[in-house]
Each structure stands twice: as structure tokens, then as C-alpha cells.
Amino acid sequence: MLLLINVILTLWVSCANGQVKPCDFPDIKHGGLFHENMRRPYFPVAVGKYYSYYCDEHFETPSGSYWDYIHCTQNGWSPAVPCLRKCYFPYLENGYNQNYGRKFVQGNSTEVACHPGYGLPKAQTTVTCTEKGWSPTPRCIRVRTCSKSDIEIENGFISESSSIYILNKEIQYKCKPGYATADGNSSGSITCLQNGWSAQPICINSSEKCGPPPPISNGDTTSFLLKVYVPQSRVEYQCQPYYELQGSNYVTCSNGEWSEPPRCIHPCIITEENMNKNNIKLKGRSDRKYYAKTGDTIEFMCKLGYNANTSILSFQAVCREGIVEYPRCE
């Protein structure tokens, strides 16, 4: 008992003098100290102390043995993870078994090679040995495949010899001379996805492609512009606030040209200044500034103390492409 008190006092004095922190009793996950019940009363211990420990079944020390030594260092116990999981690679049905029976240690990863048409869940290609075992479990399951016969390509060809492609497989195609992809390149690629091929290959005559669609005043396209558009591509336009779109919202690429773009018609801006000049105000409204679209009817009335100086019909003015004729009161 006296020896234990001396050890504790020595450690306390060392800490008080700014020396390194001692080590508490080690918590060895999936293992433990040999004779730990006998050793526990002597903790904490000084830097430099070491003890033999063991690992549970399915675990091993970093040196690969059943037991080893754990050391108290300035940074704590070393090794920090005394017991590591052992994972043995299982036999793979529908896969290649070059790793069958091989041991991997916690933190190690390895690639899994499955037969064509098979793969790991979620299209993964590697598995990792973790504290709880393999993640994901090494098994080759039937996966989505894409057939070369489902590809329709005009004015181009696919040079690959395979007829079946696994999920996420990308293949290249080339266009014949005088033809190009939608991006203007001589070749492109498509990918096998869960619902089939990502797209059908496109090889179009260079003369049939369109450049960016024409700009319009007081409006813009609703999508980012491309450098090249394939035939029958459509682009949508929209106008700035208060402007009215006249014509079709869309233009279409055909024979290398775009269809007629729409126009954005100016609104009529009814200002307090113009109304004061004519001694009028908006009927039933108190706006100091009012926007009206082409075709809208704007109703005016005379200010208090003034009488109409123009026809009664003029007080129901119609907005025509940004122009409105104001009535007048005297």
C-alpha cells in the first residue's frame, strides 16, 4: 500500500513541475492487459512504462500477433489502436477469386473483380476491412447491363467489339467524315445507366447545325447558351419585367437556321409628371407611376377643379407598344 502511495505522489509531483502527463489505465477495445486486475491499482503510470496485452478472436496486434506490448508515451498509449480486425477474403460466386482466403487487416482495401454482368452493390468496385468486418460485403450480384444492339447511330460507328456492357461502363463512338457530335467533335461517348444508355449517339451534318440563337432587345434566353445546336433543338426566350413577349416563346434550329425569334414589346409608363402636365390622374388608383402592357386600357379622370378638354373616349387610353395618348383637362 505504501508503494502505491509513493507512485501516485511521484506522478503528481512530476505533473506539478511541468513534466509530461502520465497514462491512465488503457482501454483496449477487443482486447485487454494480461493480469489487468492485478495491474489496475498502479495506474496512472509514467511515460516509458509498457505492458503486455492480448487481442480477442478475429483481432490481432499491429505486428500481426496474438499479443504484444503497449507503451506509455508523451502522446498517450502506443499503439493508439492496439487490436485490429482481421478480415479473410471469402470465395466469390460470379467473380474472380485471386484474393480467396487472403488476410486483410482493419483499414486495408482491395478491388473486387466480378464476372461480366455482375458487380458489387451500388456499383462499388472496392471493399474495406473495418472494425465490424468487410464493408461492403464482398459479393457479386447481377447488375444492370446495356446491349450494343440497343444503340442506334446514324452517320457514325462504334469500334468496340463487346456486345454487353455493365453499369457505368462508358463507350466511345465516332462520326463519319463531314459529320460531328452536338458539341462539334468528331467523337463522343455514352454511358450505361440504370435505365439504359445515357443517350443515343448523335452525328449530324455540319451544315445542319445552328450556332447560338439570335439575341432579342429587352429579353434573353431562359437557359445558358451553347456554341452548337443540333437540328430541331429548341431554345426558350423571356422578356424583362413589364415587357410583353410577342410571338412564340421558342425558336427551333432547322437546316442550320433558327426560326423567327419573338419580340419584347415596350410597356407604357404612366408617370406623375405627364399626368400633372395634363391635369389628370388615374381613375381608381393612387399610383405615382404605373406600367401597362400593349393592349391594356388605362382609365384617367380630371383632377379636382379641372374639366375635360378632349373627348370622353380619350380618357380610356390604350397602350400601344410603349406609347399612350394622354387626355387633357383645363
UniProtKB/Swiss-Prot annotation:
Positions of disulphide bridges: 23-72, 55-83, 87-129, 114-140, 146-192, 175-203, 210-253, 239-264, 268-319, 302-329
Entry keyword set: Disulfide bond, Glycoprotein, Hemolytic uremic syndrome, Repeat, Secreted, Signal, Sushi
Compartment(s): Secreted
Claim: Membrane is one of the keywords in the record: no
InterPro entries per UniProt: ComplSys_Reg/VirEntry_Med, Sushi/SCR/CCP_sf, Sushi_SCR_CCP_dom
Signal sequence bounds: 1-18
SMART domains, A to Z: CCP
Tissue specificity field: Expressed by the liver and secreted in plasma.
PROSITE patterns the UniProt entry points to: SUSHI
An annotated Gene Ontology molecular function: complement component C3b binding
Location, primary (coarse class): secreted
Domain Sushi stretches: 22-84, 85-142, 144-205, 208-266, 267-330
Glycosylation sites: 108, 185, 205, 309
GO cellular component, one term: extracellular space
Superkingdom: Eukaryota
Gene Ontology biological process terms in this record: complement activation
Primary role: Might be involved in complement regulation.
Disease: Hemolytic uremic syndrome, atypical, 1: An atypical form of hemolytic uremic syndrome. It is a complex genetic disease characterized by microangiopathic hemolytic anemia, thrombocytopenia, renal failure and absence of episodes of enterocolitis and diarrhea. In contrast to typical hemolytic uremic syndrome, atypical forms have a poorer prognosis, with higher death rates and frequent progression to end-stage renal disease.
Protein name per Swiss-Prot or TrEMBL: Complement factor H-related protein 3
Lineage, top ranks: Eukaryota, Metazoa, Chordata, Craniata, Vertebrata
